[in-house]
Amino acid sequence: MHHLLEQSADMATALLAGEKLRELILPGAQDDKAGALAALLLQLKLELPFDRVVTIGTVLVPILLVTLVFTKNFAEEPIYCYTPHNFTRDQALYARGYCWTELRDALPGVDASLWPSLFEHKFLPYALLAFAAIMYVPALGWEFLASTRLTSELNFLLQEIDNCYHRAAEGRAPKIEKQIQSKGPGITEREKREIIENAEKEKSPEQNLFEKYLERRGRSNFLAKLYLARHVLILLLSAVPISYLCTYYATQKQNEFTCALGASPDGAAGAGPAVRVSCKLPSVQLQRIIAGVDIVLLCVMNLIILVNLIHLFIFRKSNFIFDKLHKVGIKTRRQWRRSQFCDINILAMFCNENRDHIKSLNRLDFITNESDLMYDNVVRQLLAALAQSNHDATPTVRDSGVQTVDPSANPAEPDGAAEPPVVKRPRKKMKWIPTSNPLPQPFKEPLAIMRVENSKAEKPKPARRKTATDTLIAPLLDRSAHHYKGGGGDPGPGPAPAPAPPPAPDKKHARHFSLDVHPYILGTKKAKAEAVPAALPASRSQEGGFLSQAEDCGLGLAPAPIKDAPLPEKEIPYPTEPARAGLPSGGPFHVRSPPAAPAVAPLTPASLGKAEPLTILSRNATHPLLHINTLYEAREEEDGGPRLPQDVGDLIAIPAPQQILIATFDEPRTVVSTVEF
């Protein structure tokens, strides 16, 4: 009974998911929410962005420049005339109006009919306005000749592109799915491909009609001719303003002239004497600048038009219709791709500009991006996943009982040592939550691992490994600690005390000389006691680098006593012999005086050549390579083991020259003869 209830719930969930997905991929009421209001607001764009740029550059910008010139002429006087001081106000106004009308430079000694005219300065603003109107003629002709036909073509084409997707989603995909299900679970991929190919061959009458329409538009070139004629006409008409403005910029540079008042226009001799008045045109410089800007702007627009036409009819490879329609079963001819001069290419550009009118555009983009899968295959897989509602393919979490090993467990430990911690995810079912978003919400499993980690016991602090550096420095630190605590007495010869245990790793004053940190224990079990590794073997030079307490006692070296404490022996001042150079300088030391120092034999040539046994410590200042540990190394080799000298005073005596074996690390030994002077 429980199994039947669970299966019915799974079936209901599958049906609900299928309904939501059908609303997403199939046309429904959500596509027509705006209705007629959206149709009124959305109007077809009959100009491409490139066409709008050309119109702005050739029409609107020159009009703005003309407006600037007219504004300057109305804001101030277009001409300044410097009349004599005896002229009345009316005479001055008459002289200014007469000179603005004539605009002829009365050169002395030149016939009046040959006087140069400055009328181009006065005519330039009107010429710019006329050129702007002329450059708008191609756009106006395109609007009248192609707008009606282009509007009807775009309406039909955009609607059919939208319907192609709907027909494929509603008709072909369910039919393919039904045929695949009829084959049973043993169907192969080859049989599936054959079913899909056969379904593609079976086309509806609407699809056949749309393919015929595309074929007819591919053989027609009416819109292509109109589009090409529009831009070629712009190139031809722009030659007129460019030539005129270049001539004006090159010839009209004069802004001052002499106006002859009272002279007859035809230069008759019967006229009275003329009064010459100097005049100036203040807007000449501004007009020259505007003419130069207009020339550059028109040249740039012509270059842009040429590049766009070459790209459109020669080098363009992408096509909005070709990229979209072949994904929904509409066949296109390759000859349309080779021949760019046809209406289908012009319509493709305008379809891309009006793509907001295609309601299923997002779905078409999804199909186009999935280039490795056919659209029918994608829809078939979606519907097949929703149609299966058996026990193994329900939208419940069937694999929720799979055990997952805790990532915090230590992988180095053997499996038999302890039972590995296991995280068991609870079994839960996915519940559909209806929202305004048609997309299904992703199922999020609870983070069980995070809960287990939060419930773990506090992890123990890591234990630091003891390195060779700590082994060498620990005796020195222990002796220094005893010295500063007040234990400065003479320890006397005796056995070396046992080394102090290393400080606890959690003490704050512990000095760490190594960066090697033990990794944290990432398990839930108790931390095991970590065995301290043995000290690394050091070389002979490192073993003698620091003296232990037993060696200090044997050599007669003791820490300096505390203040006011009686010295056990007489303190010997620093002598001049080089034997003191071999004492270590690790801390303050005092040397005990021996009972009787033996006599030193004088140096003779016979004694220089003789090699005596090594019984006394001697270090020559001229050989800095000698160290105090060299003595012990040589004596250990001769006697077979380490031993201390019988008399401490022998350390201070100056021995006779002898042969000393020097052993530095593992290098070959060298015989050195020392000579005392």
UniProtKB/Swiss-Prot annotation:
Glycosylated residues in this chain: N86
Region (Disordered): 393-423, 454-510
Annotated GO CC locations: endoplasmic reticulum membrane; Golgi membrane; plasma membrane
Family that this chain belongs to: Belongs to the pannexin family.
InterPro entries recorded: Innexin (IPR000990), Pannexin (IPR039099)
Subunit relationships: Homoheptameric.
Extracellular compartment segments: 71-123, 250-292
Keywords: Cell membrane, Endoplasmic reticulum, Glycoprotein, Golgi apparatus, Ion channel, Ion transport, Membrane, Phosphoprotein, Transmembrane, Transmembrane helix, Transport
Membrane topology: Multi-pass membrane protein
Main location: membrane
The protein's name in its UniProt record: Pannexin-2
Reactions mediated catalytically: ATP(in) = ATP(out); chloride(in) = chloride(out); iodide(out) = iodide(in); Na(+)(in) = Na(+)(out)
